[in-house]
Amino acid sequence: MLFFIKVFMKTILSVLLLFFIFASSFTLVVGLAGCRPDQIQALTQFKNEFDSSDCNQTDYFNGVQCDNKTGVVTKLQLPSGCLHGSMKPNSSLFGLQHLRYLNLSNNNFTSASLPSGFGNLNRLEVLYLSSNGFLGQVPSSFSNLSQLNILDLSHNELTGSFPFVQNLTKLSILVLSYNHFSGTIPSSLLTLPFLSSLDLRENYLTGSIEAPNSSTSSRLEFMYLGNNHFEGQILEPISKLINLKHLDLSFLKTSYPIDLNLFSSFKSLVRLVLSGNSLLATSITSDSKIPLNLENLVLLSCGLIEFPTILKNLTKLEHIDLSNNKIKGKVPEWFWNLPRLRRVNLFNNLFTDLEGSEEVLVNSSVRLLDLAYNHFRGPFPKPPLSINLLSAWNNSFTGNIPLETCNRSSLAILDLSYNNLTGPIPRCLSDFQESLIVVNLRKNNLEGSLPDIFSDGALLRTLDVGYNQLTGKLPRSLLNCSMLRFVSVDHNKIKDTFPFWLKALPDLQALTLRSNKFHGPISPPDRGPLAFPKLRILEISDNNFTGSLPPNYFVNWEASSLQMNEDGRIYMGDYNNPYYIYEDTVDLQYKGLFMEQGKVLTSYATIDFSGNKLEGQIPESIGLLKALIALNLSNNAFTGHIPLSLANVTELESLDLSRNQLSGTIPNGLKTLSFLAYISVAHNQLIGEIPQGTQITGQSKSSFEGNAGLCGLPLQGSCFAPPTPQPKEEDEDEEVLNWKAVVIGYWPGLLLGLIMAHVIASFKPKWLVKIVGPEKRKEDNPVRLFMTLDSRWDSFNNKKNVEQKSDM
């Protein structure tokens, strides 16, 4: 009976503690009901050590597991990005000494060293601490974690060596990649009896490695050593690890070529990565020996000049990457007959043609085909029936887009940009719009109108048909593409009005209409805000748009009103799979230059209305677009003042307001824009002093020319220099006569004065010495005195003028 009372009281205490801890959030965390009160308190204290406002109570404690019998915390897995701040050396986390599983990866810990307190958690079997920004060496206390099976410290800033692993005898997976570890690999590492996976990529490791004496004693199956600084004969000991299934030796920086025959004994090897290494030429022929079970072979940037015939023997090959080499000529016909070939990357070589019948490619099993950046010419080949991704940009293909492309119902990405294709865009592209995500036909010679073919449920996210000869109007069926993010039809002959109707697309981020025949107003009929929900790039330059912009035009541009996204890794059109990355490209007139911008950040915001016939005042609401990087309103007919609110656009790097009819002064607040690298207000009607800030005075004079009333650097030194008097032409004759009279009266007096001075200097009469005194200072020269008074009078007048202007 006493036992049941104790259990009951223990449960009551746990529930009461839960109530008091979480009453303010009105959230019942059921998962903690089996945890002891002291354990719940430790978890709560750990949470309170950080700013955890990005996650709610439920998210935080969903990753907690407690032992059903003892109530101690055995598992803690926090959601990514939940914690902000630095981890204390005496954190309450280290009091949870019964933890067996701990995952704190991808949080926002302030850069600091790894606390040695982790060594107190000696029951840990799994520890994930990747992507947290930890600095310095791994504490020696980590050698106490003798029960560890999995240790992941990848994607941090850790340094030094890692001798602590020699005591981790139960370790099966060790991930230390993407750090700054240096020195040699400990000799004891490969002798760990249970080690099956080792990832040391992207460090500064040197020397060689020492493999176990007996090849059967190593259980190592996955080994990743790429991007280090090994100098010695590292391949010889690796060749003894015959149980390997995955091996990455990319960019080893060794001084000798790699012989593929070294891997002939790897009967289980299915993935081999040798990118960035020189290969022994004789080892890539069909006579060489290579593991026949290979499914994935990556030979990127290996300096190859001939197609490796060793591939003939790899009947199980699924993925081959030969990109960034110098292979020339034709792709051999036998290559497409490899029965399990799925992914082929031939990017950036010197290929000119495909050998054999086009049916060989059509009937192949290839799903991902990258032929981009080669010298292919002639008609574009019919793609494989099984194709998912087809990239052939930057070649010299000619003729029409094959209609057979439309029969590839699983095609998701089609990129045929930068070729010489002609004819219309096939209407049959609608046949696979339920799979099509990207259509990029940029910079060809395509004609006709853009097909109005999109129906409900279309998955299209990117449509880029810029730099063609397209006519007609924008297809209204684009409204059915609810996932559309990027639309570029620039440099065509499309004749239409501004597509206000595209505001209905909830995810549209970039709209480029540059250099077409668009016309009419760009203000909504109700004169309200334009208000695209997520639009960040709006390029409509060099059209025939007219009218004025209402004061609230830039209100409710939600995406562009936000501050810059600090995550610089996210790009528009970043539709990637493990083997291919597609990124949108946009042409920008930026910092006075016209450039093609690849890898456009989702946080990037730019507006270009230049080269139209827009008039009226520039709306003050432009200052709401805090994420704006570039603003170009040049070559229009804008009037009025430059908006003072531009000083609020703190991310602005490029501002072009040239060739308008703007008046007034340049706002002084522009000099506070610390990122402003380019500004042009040339050829307006501006007056007054140019703001004297480093970002502005460092600009070229041409950025301010054509404004008669502007002064100050970089045009001239000061706006307040005294004017130089210019004689009037009608007074010149009179002045000449006056000077003649002065000279005639001057010379006799001058001659008499010189004679008297000579007498005084020679004889020094005592009466003169008594009057003047031998040490009495000389009086000011009357001419110099007059010039001094005149200078002070000018200074007084200048000061008075400045005060009057400042009062105005």
Swiss-Prot record:
It is found in: Cell membrane. Residues 762-808 are cytoplasmic. Residues 32-740 are extracellular. It comes from the Eukaryota. Glycans are attached at residues 56, 68, 90, 103, 108, 144, 167, 213, 313, 363, 394, 407, 420, 480, 544, 632, 648. Gene3D superfamilies: Ribonuclease Inhibitor (3.80.10.10). Keywords: Cell membrane, Glycoprotein, Leucine-rich repeat, Membrane, Receptor, Repeat, Signal, Transmembrane, Transmembrane helix. The keyword 4Fe-4S does not apply. LRR repeats lie at residues 96-120, 122-144, 145-170, 172-192, 193-218, 220-241, 242-265, 266-291, 293-314, 315-338, 340-363, 364-387, 388-407, 408-434, 436-456, 457-481, 483-504, 505-529, 532-556, 601-625, 626-649, 650-673, 675-698. The keyword rRNA-binding does not apply. It is a single-pass type I membrane protein. One of its GO terms (cellular component) is plasma membrane. It holds the Pfam family LRR_8. Residues 1-31 form the signal peptide. InterPro entries: Leu-rich_rpt (IPR001611), Leu-rich_rpt_typical-subtyp (IPR003591), LRR_dom_sf (IPR032675), LRR_R13L4/SHOC2-like (IPR055414), RLP23-like (IPR046956). Its main location: membrane. The chain crosses the membrane at residues 741-761. Belongs to the RLP family. This is Receptor like protein 27.
